[in-house]
Structure formats: structure tokens, C-alpha cells
Amino acid sequence: AICKKPSKFFKGACGRDADCEKACDQENWPGGVCVPFLRCECQRSC
């Protein structure tokens, strides 16, 4: 299963998954993707 949470560090509209991933990395979450409404969502295995 994959756990998801909104990024606390990401600011602004999410256009590139790589930028989102960097923000999630700071939160010790290995993955991050842009989701609808231009938000950054961090993901990791549960």
C-alpha cells in the first residue's frame, strides 16, 4: 500500500514531479508527485 500526505515544504503551484520530490525528501518521504489542483503530494510505502 502507498501512504500519501500533502507536502509541508512545497510552495506554489506544482508543475514538475522532480520539484515536488525534492520537497518531500526534506520531510523524509522518498517520493512526491504533483496531483490535481497543482498540489504536491508526498508518497511512501506503508
From Swiss-Prot:
Q: Which InterPro entries match?
A: Defensin_plant, Scorpion_toxin-like, Scorpion_toxin-like_sf
Q: What cystine linkages occur within this chain? A: C3-C46, C14-C34, C20-C40, C24-C42
Q: Quick check: keyword Disulfide bond in the entry?
A: yes
Entry keyword set: Antibiotic, Antimicrobial, Disulfide bond, Fungicide, Plant defense
What Pfam families has UniProt attached to this entry?
Gamma-thionin
| Tissue note | Leaves and flowers.
Source organism, top-level taxon: Eukaryota
Name of this protein: Defensin-like protein AX1
**Organism listed in the record:** Beta vulgaris
Upper lineage: Eukaryota, Viridiplantae, Streptophyta, Embryophyta, Tracheophyta
